[in-house]
Amino acid sequence: MRGMTTPASLPFTGNDAADRLLVDEPLALLIGFALDQQVTVQKAFSGPAELKRRLGHLDAARIAAMDPDELNAVFRERPALHRFPGAMAGKVQALCAAVSRDFGNDARRVWSEAPDGPSLEARLLSLPGIGGMKAKSLIAVLGKQFDVRPPGYEDVAPTWPTLGDVDSAEALASYQAGKRAHKAALRETARG
């Protein structure tokens, strides 16, 4: 694996502190990806910072050990952390349990110990809340923003635009506009 670099932040939220947290705490990045569905990128990736504010930490083992009803209440506190706070509380708790159990409570190990690209993808896919498209996008972010490119990275890296290409607020706006246009085209095709 090439040497891991660390960007100053990932410009996904519009909030400097939340953007820095995505870089400073690897679990925050994973939680952001888990939350990235049916809400804006900004809402999904600001979730880890708000969760940390509410809990006082982002420790995978501690989150995994929480009473599910208590975590659910934290997610539902206004403003809710997600459009579907109950479901996402469960996903994040399962994600944290996997990080704690399978990666020694160190989210960075998910990628830092992957010997090759296919293993990196398999490790990401093993995490609750991370499906195929999210894994590909995470691979792109790790490769393009953190220089995490183990042997065989090119075999699993996406060839389409992803959050890995977002390095500024302008790039995020362009990415989101492209994603909306793609979804509109798919809907139009489905109407036939």
How should each PLM-predicted stretch be described?
Residues 51-126:
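Alpha-helical ds-nucleic-acid-binding substructure associated with the helix-hairpin-helix region
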Residues 39-43, 56, 100-103, 146-147:
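Short alpha-helix boundary/capping elements
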Residues 30-34:
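Short, aromatic/basic-rich helix-turn unit that serves as a nucleic-acid recognition element
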Residues 1-20, 24, 117-122, 132-192:
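C-terminal accessory module of base-excision DNA glycosylases/AP lyases that mediates lesion recognition
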Residues 45-51:
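Short Gly/aromatic-enriched secondary-structure transition segments
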Residues 17-28, 38-40, 82-87:
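Structural motif
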